[in-house]
C-alpha cells in the first residue's frame, strides 16, 4: 500500500520534533533524555488516526535522510507493535517508493539487525523520562500493517 509519510524527525537525531497539524509549523518538543538517536526517518501519515489519538506513526527506510516536514512517497511493509503510557502506539515501517527498494516487499525482507535496532530504540528511548514507558510486542507483517493502516483511516473518518 502506497502512503505519503510526513517526516518529523530525521534519522540520527535526538531532537524530538512535532509538526503542528493546523499550522504546519515544526516545533522542538524535547531533546531525548536517553543518549539514543532515531534509527530511521520518523513521521506520520496524514488523514489517519492511531489508537493514541494522533496520526499513525511511520518510519521510512531511505538512502539518505530528509528534513522535517518533507513528504516521502513510501510503501508500507510491516509494523512494530507497541504500547506506551497513552495506550496503543504502533509504528508502521515503510520504504521509499523507488526501484532501489523493490527487493523489500514485506517485513521478512528487512534484516533482523535493523528490526532489533528499531525495537531497542522504541523500547528504551523513554527510559529516563519520569512516568513514561514503552512495551514492545513484536513485529507484524505487511498484511497486518495494512490492516492497522486501514483501521486508522476509518477511525479518522469517523
Curated annotation (Swiss-Prot):
Mg(2+) 2 binds at residues 8, 57. The active site is at 89 (proton acceptor). GO terms for biological process: phosphate-containing compound metabolic process. PROSITE patterns: PPASE (PS00387). Its EC number is 3.6.1.1. Its cofactor is Mg(2+). Keywords: Cytoplasm, Hydrolase, Magnesium, Metal-binding. Homohexamer. Catalyzes the hydrolysis of inorganic pyrophosphate (PPi) forming two phosphate ions. This is Inorganic pyrophosphatase.
